[in-house]
């Protein structure tokens, strides 16, 4: 490991109900100074089928959380009620109301507890980021808790389960498609946006169809809300290095209030895979070639 590596801290906290124990991880910068104030970033997934507080650290999400911390943030991962690998009652707490998976109220309660224990965690500057179900929960956080979450980056979010796979949406939201589906849809709360929201999506995404982000985008437009949108014409259910760099810039600028490096080059595994495919002679251009059938 790098000499400056700082392992995340495991924490036990109390859920918003005041009695249920929830678990979390806290990532701090390698040069952490308890005398300073650090904005907090909540790295969320929120899908009922998984949990973030692990017995090991092999998942790429931990590297992303640690990378954000190195930019001068305290990054937290919290397994609120409705996530997996606990009791049946804990796991199924979000059934029929998937918007409560990992429970944003629990996340808010946890961050407030962490700020009270360590004042270096600036509870007045809280951001949130997530991918896929985490993108859904990130937008939900900005729309349902606009006074707490100030900046959010929602990547590839399934913002309405009516547009998502029935093997995920109906599995956790239930059937028939009734009023509860209106309650889970982020567009229902578009009028509440106050903070800075960046929506990110790949236009070739077959995991979460781009219609999900376009629907939310239109709802925000209908309510005359300011937001940011970053689309990738060649990306599927993934984000290239350029997208990661832009998310870093977004937090540095809007949450930390500092200047980000201009056009810093960052490559992801996706970028290297595309370079490898191109080197094999595969043409990645989608335009039709002369003489091909139309």
What kind of feature is each model-predicted range?
Residues 1-294:
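Serine-hydrolase catalytic core recognition
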């Amino acid at each position: 490991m790098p000499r400056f590596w700082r392992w995340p801290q495991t924490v036990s906290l109390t859920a918003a109900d005041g009695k249920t124990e929830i678990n979390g991880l806290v990532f701090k910068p390698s040069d952490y100074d308890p005398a300073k104030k650090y904005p907090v970033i909540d790295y969320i997934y929120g899908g009922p089928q998984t949990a973030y507080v692990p017995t090991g650290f092999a998942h790429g999400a931990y590297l992303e959380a640690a990378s954000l911390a190195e930019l001068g943030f305290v990054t937290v991962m919290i397994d609120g009620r409705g996530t997996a690998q606990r009791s049946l009652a804990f796991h199924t707490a979000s059934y029929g109301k998937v918007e409560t998976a990992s429970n944003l109220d629990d996340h808010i309660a946890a961050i407030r507890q962490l700020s009270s224990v360590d004042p270096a965690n600036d509870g007045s500057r809280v951001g949130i980021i997530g991918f896929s179900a985490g993108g859904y929960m990130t937008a939900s956080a900005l729309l349902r808790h606009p006074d707490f979450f100030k900046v959010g980056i929602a990547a590839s979010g399934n913002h309405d389960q009516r547009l998502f796979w029935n093997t995920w949406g109906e599995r956790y939201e239930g059937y028939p498609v009734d009023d509860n589906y209106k309650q889970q849809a982020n567009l229902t709360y578009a009028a509440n946006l106050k903070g800075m929201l960046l929506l990110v999506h790949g236009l070739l995404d077959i995991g979460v169809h781009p219609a999900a982000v376009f629907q939310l985008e239109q709802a925000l437009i209908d309510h005359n809300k300011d937001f940011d949108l970053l689309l990738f014409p060649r990306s599927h259910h993934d984000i290239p290095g350029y997208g990661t760099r832009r998310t870093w810039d977004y937090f540095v600028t809007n949450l930390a209030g500092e200047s980000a490096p201009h056009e810093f080059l960052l490559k992801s595994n996706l970028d290297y895979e595309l370079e490898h495919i191109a080197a094999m002679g595969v043409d990645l251009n989608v335009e039709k070639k002369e003489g091909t059938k139309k």
